[in-house]
């Protein structure tokens, strides 16, 4: 008989059992195994500028020296903001490619001459553009591959059996985790579990990660935030106080009203920007989490939720990136379903309350609890099991 109980499992479920599975831990893994990928993400992603993430510009350069093995015994520079913010919301910040910084670096490496000049070489021209592609690929395909390898190293901490939860083993499970601890630790049948973003047993590099930002909407928001900055004004002052037409690539690419009137200085810079913009757009498209197609591919699961009477959310942050899945669940279930949602911090309580308002869940149909409470219930129901 099909169970009327659905569990929705998030990363907090594995964290509760002692698995070091936060994205901050993934950062530590990259530092040990793929520092170039780490350096790329630290330097070029997130709303903070490259300089503000480090104590000095020399530290920025040392990131790449160390990651490429060019530094003898150097220690990776401490990036407080990256460690405390960027990686805690890793998937969200995949949408925060710092276009400005990438174009600044491109401008440095571009040949300082025109295509018809004697000193021009196409290999120099494509060196910068290929560098952009390498950087973006390291945060796309290489990042996915390394994430999968890291997932396969995860384990629950010693003594986790004392913390096992009282879970209905006949229920249905929708998990956002890639780990298989529901099967290997709790003995849940694989046929009862839907791994919505993939499982560690899938082909390497196939796990689904990505941001939820709308490409067009995110771009417009970025332009609006930056359009009044001094560096994006049509005219700038040089060190002697003389005005000159803004020639920064980010300004020419995104804020110049008439491209034909820009201070491009050479056709090389103009052509390079057009190619770079195309590569940026490809990156955003590849790294946007395809929730609509994922939901469509799992429609059999969602259509089967009509009989659900109780939903238990264990360790899920109820983040915006996953709301489309909850929208589809809400469409499939009845209006009298009882919810129980775990919380860990005061911020979680606020998220749960906002979640209930969004879906019209009254307070008498939503029980908030800590995962430790389920562990206590397990001790009461089956004291010999641990």
For every predicted segment, state its role:
Residues 1-40:
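An N-terminal structural lobe/cap that precedes and organizes the functional/catalytic core
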């Amino acid at each position: 008989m099909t169970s009327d109980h659905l569990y929705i499992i998030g990363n907090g479920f594995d964290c509760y059992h002692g698995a070091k599975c936060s994205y901050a831990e993934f950062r530590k893994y990259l530092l040990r195994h793929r520092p170039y990928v780490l350096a790329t993400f630290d330097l070029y992603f997130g709303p903070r500028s490259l300089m503000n993430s480090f104590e000095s510009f020399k530290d920025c350069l040392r990131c790449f020296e160390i990651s490429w093995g060019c530094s003898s015994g150097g220690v990776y520079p401490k990036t407080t903001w990256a460690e405390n913010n960027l990686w805690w919301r890793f998937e969200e910040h995949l949408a925060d490619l710092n276009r400005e910084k990438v174009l600044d670096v491109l401008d440095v490496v571009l040949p300082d001459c025109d295509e018809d000049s004697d000193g021009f070489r196409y290999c120099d021209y494509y060196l910068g553009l290929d560098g952009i592609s390498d950087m973006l690929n390291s945060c796309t395909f290489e990042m996915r591959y390394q994430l999968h390898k890291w997932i396969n190293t995860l384990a629950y901490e010693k003594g986790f059996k004392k913390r096992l939860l009282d879970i209905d083993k006949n229920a249905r499970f929708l998990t956002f985790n890639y780990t298989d601890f529901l099967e290997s630790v709790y003995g849940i049948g694989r046929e009862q579990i839907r791994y919505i973003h993939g499982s560690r047993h899938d082909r390497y590099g196939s796990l689904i990660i990505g941001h939820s930002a709308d490409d067009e909407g995110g771009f417009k928001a970025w332009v609006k935030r930056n359009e009044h900055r001094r560096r994006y004004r049509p005219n700038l002052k040089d060190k002697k106080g003389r005005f000159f037409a803004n020639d920064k690539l980010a300004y020419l690419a995104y804020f110049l009203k008439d491209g034909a009137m820009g201070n491009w200085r050479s056709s090389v810079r103009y052509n390079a920007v057009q190619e770079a913009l195309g590569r940026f757009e490809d990156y955003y498209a590849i790294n946007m989490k395809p929730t609509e197609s994922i939901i469509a591919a799992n429609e059999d699961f969602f259509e089967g939720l009509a009989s659900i009477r109780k939903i238990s959310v264990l360790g899920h942050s109820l983040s915006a990136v996953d709301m489309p899945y909850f929208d589809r669940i809400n469409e499939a279930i009845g209006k009298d379903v009882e919810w129980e949602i775990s919380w860990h911090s005061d911020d979680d309580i606020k998220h749960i309350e906002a979640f209930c308002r969004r879906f019209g869940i009254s307070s008498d149909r939503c029980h908030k609890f800590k995962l430790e409470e389920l562990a206590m219930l397990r001790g009461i129901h089956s004291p010999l099991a641990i």
